[in-house]
Amino acid sequence: MKIHEYQGKEILRSFGVPVPRGIPAFTVQEAVEAAQKLGGPVWVVKAQIHAGGRGKGGGVKVAKSIDDVKKLAGDILGMQLKTHQTGPEGQKVRRLYIEDGADIKNELYVSLVTDRATQKVALIASSEGGMDIEEVAHSTPDKIVTEMIDPLTGITPEQGRKVAEAIGLSGKSVDQALDIFAKLYKCYMDTDASLVEINPLNCDSKGDLMALDAKFNFDANALFRHPEIVALRDLDEEDPAEVEASKFDLAYISLDGNIGCLVNGAGLAMATMDTIKLFGGEPANFLDVGGGATPEKVTEAFKIMLKNPKVEGILVNIFGGIMKCDTIATGVITACKAVNLNVPLVVRMKGTNEELGKKMLAESGLPIIAADTMAEAATKIVAAVK
């Protein structure tokens, strides 16, 4: 789960990480009132969307008067902001953050992310923060510093000092960095985050550090422990199909192809998409119905897939372990009738009650194309949509 910058900064502030004063705004009038309350003389008007690259996309602007704030707020609110993370369609801006301007001297980068290979938390930092951090990571990876933190000990002063000095800090800035790193790590652990990123972490002309941006990703599996974080969720920033799927406990991710996929098990789902690609097709989604799918869940899965106008065919690939093939067959038949299916459907079933499931589909009177192997299933659905 992601949240907005202004929400992330409130979390950072609650853990003692220095951030500028700022006020969220949902209208131009609220933006003007926020600027008046902050007092100026310089403000930053920031688009709030769940994507990076806002500055390059024109979603972050500096204002030097209340009139500037009013004009910029009007320009940015409602715009379709396009960045390298939104895709070509962009993301509509529905919220702004009006913030005090900052004395920017040196933009640094710092983040925490779980490293599954080492089972530790990676503290990643760079002296080259700001809008071009992706290019820095690609072109000059030697400017990226990584320190692995053992969850049993947490971040040590020695580790913090090593990173701070590696990104060019000295004097009191090092001590401030140690404090920020420790608080950031506590924030990361206490909120069950999967990513906490500050870009940039500003070092001003006096050597003081402050987080000028905040990005959070949270582990969805741990959200039951954090109702206060769940309350920050902005459904307008999420794919409507994915939001709908989550209501039925379906793992769904939209893709750009034209072949809908319904599979049980994440590994099999990924293998199914790979096989479709191998035979010249393009998957329209990732959809894992899980091991406890009911006919009702299968029906909802079909409805969600078919809301995508790009879907020209559907491939159902089921391995019957805990999930019985006859249960899926019942769901497929019910779904086909409920949605009045009018695109080709290929079904491949293997495992528990396989023969019964196949018999039910064959006797359903529906134009369902059967397949015995993944290769056969992929070949048939690719041919059917061409």
Curated annotation (Swiss-Prot):
**Domain ATP-grasp as annotated: residue spans:** 9-244
- Spell out the disulfide connections: none
Q: What is its EC number?
A: 6.2.1.5
Question: Keywords assigned by UniProt?
Answer: ATP-binding, Ligase, Magnesium, Metal-binding, Nucleotide-binding, Tricarboxylic acid cycle
Q: Name one GO molecular function term.
A: succinate-CoA ligase (GDP-forming) activity
Q: Which residues bind ATP?
A: 46, 53-55, 99, 102, 107
Name the GO cellular-component terms.
cytosol; succinate-CoA ligase complex
GO terms, biological process: succinyl-CoA metabolic process; tricarboxylic acid cycle
Q: Which residues bind Mg(2+)?
A: 199, 213
What catalytic reaction does the record list? Answer: succinate + ATP + CoA = succinyl-CoA + ADP + phosphate; GTP + succinate + CoA = succinyl-CoA + GDP + phosphate
State the source organism's domain of life: Bacteria
Q: In which pathway does it act?
A: Carbohydrate metabolism; tricarboxylic acid cycle; succinate from succinyl-CoA (ligase route): step 1/1
Report the HAMAP family cross-referenced here: Succ_CoA_beta (MF_00558)
Tell me the function of this protein: Succinyl-CoA synthetase functions in the citric acid cycle (TCA), coupling the hydrolysis of succinyl-CoA to the synthesis of either ATP or GTP and thus represents the only step of substrate-level phosphorylation in the TCA. The beta subunit provides nucleotide specificity of the enzyme and binds the substrate succinate, while the binding sites for coenzyme A and phosphate are found in the alpha subunit.
List the protein's name.
Succinate--CoA ligase [ADP-forming] subunit beta
The organism is Paracidovorax citrulli (strain AAC00-1) (Acidovorax citrulli)
Taxonomic path: Bacteria, Pseudomonadati, Pseudomonadota, Betaproteobacteria, Burkholderiales
